[in-house]
């Protein structure tokens, strides 16, 4: 099995786990995310659009930003240079 198949399977396994989270814990506790789309939807979109490692970096940065120290609002997946764009968003949205 080559590395691309492994990452493909890993992507869809994580998507499956996120969907379980969305249908259980998210419904129990309500939406707490300060962004649109929510962090779980953002993560699914990242996993579908980018390779596993890029998606992992984007999901991690987004999850770290989802708290009271950052400005919420619309935050869509970057179309170009996803990691550098996400890092710029990280700095831009930090409440100083």
Swiss-Prot record:
Report the subcellular localization. Cell inner membrane
Pfam families cross-referenced by the UniProt entry? YidD
- One cellular component GO annotation, for this chain's record? plasma membrane
Record's bilayer topology term: Peripheral membrane protein
Provide this UniProt record's keywords sorted from A to Z.
Cell inner membrane, Cell membrane, Membrane
* Tree of life domain: Bacteria
Q: Does the keyword Nucleotide-binding apply?
A: no
Q: Which family does it belong to?
A: Belongs to the UPF0161 family.
Write out the function statement from the record.
Answer: Could be involved in insertion of integral membrane proteins into the membrane.
This chain belongs to which protein, by name?
A: Putative membrane protein insertion efficiency factor
Q: Which organism is it from?
A: Borreliella afzelii (strain PKo)
Query: Source organism lineage?
Result: Bacteria, Pseudomonadati, Spirochaetota, Spirochaetia, Spirochaetales
């Amino acid at each position: 099995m080559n590395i691309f198949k492994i990452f493909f399977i890993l992507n869809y396994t994580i998507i499956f786990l996120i969907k379980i989270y969305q249908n259980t814990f998210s419904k129990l506790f309500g939406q707490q995310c300060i962004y649109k789309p929510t962090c779980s939807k953002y993560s699914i979109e990242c996993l579908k659009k980018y390779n596993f490692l890029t998606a992992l970096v984007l999901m991690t940065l987004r999850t770290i930003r989802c708290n009271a120290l950052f400005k919420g609002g619309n935050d869509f997946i970057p179309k170009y240079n996803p990691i550098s764009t996400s890092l710029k968003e990280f700095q831009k949205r930090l409440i100083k």
